[in-house]
Amino acid sequence: MQLQTAVNNVFVQLSATLDQLSQDQYTQPCKTLFNATVGQHVRHIIELFQCLENGYEPGLVNYEKRLRDVRIESDKQFAAGLLTEVHQGLNRENKDLQLEACYDEHAEAPITLATNFYREVAYNLEHTIHHMALIRVGITEVSEIELPEEFGVASSTIKYRQQCAQ
C-alpha cells in the first residue's frame, strides 16, 4: 500500500534522526517550541498512531483519549522501538471507522464522524510530517545535527520544489 510505504519512509527518517540525538537533546526543552521537547513531539506522533491501531477492531477512534505516556517522551530508545511497532500495525485492510472527538473545549459530549482506516492513516502521515517540521526546529536549537532537506516537508512540497528547480 502506498500509504504504508510513505509512513515507513517518514518513520525511517525520524528513527535515523533520533539515533543522532543524545538522550539529553531528546528531552531538552526548546524555547522555540514553547519549552516542549523533541521527545514530546515524538510521543505525540506515536500515540496518535496507537489510538488508530487500538480503535481498529472496535471501529471507534478517539485521538483525545491517548495515554500521554511519559516514557515515550523521556526514553528515545523506547520511542524508536515503538515507531517500528506502529508501522507493523498498519498492515491492515481498509474498513469503515467512526472518529469520536470534541472540537470545542466547552463541549460536553463528543461528536462522531464517519471515516475509514486508510483515511486515518493518511491523516496521521500528514500530522507526522507537520510534527517533524516542529521537531526540525527543536533539533536546530539543541544540536548541530544536519537534517535531510526533506525532513518535515510534505511530499507535495518536495515535488513542487523539484518542478520549480527544472
Where are these regions (language model features)?
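Alpha-helical bundle segments that constitute or directly flank the non-heme di-iron/ferroxidase center
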Residues: M1-Q23, G39-E57
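Amphipathic alpha-helix face/heptad-repeat signature
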Residues: L3-V10, T37-V38, D75, A79-L82, ...
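Structural signal for well-ordered, non-membrane alpha-helices
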Residues: F11, S15-D19, I46-Q50, T84-N91, ...
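Short, contiguous alpha-helical
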Residues: T27-K65, P110-G152, I158
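Helix-adjacent hinge/juxtasegments
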Residues: G59-Q98
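Carboxylate-rich helix-loop segments that flank metal/cofactor sites and access channels
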Residues: R92-P110
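Short, contiguous hydrophobic alpha-helices characteristic of membrane insertion segments
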Residues: Q98-E100, A154-Q162
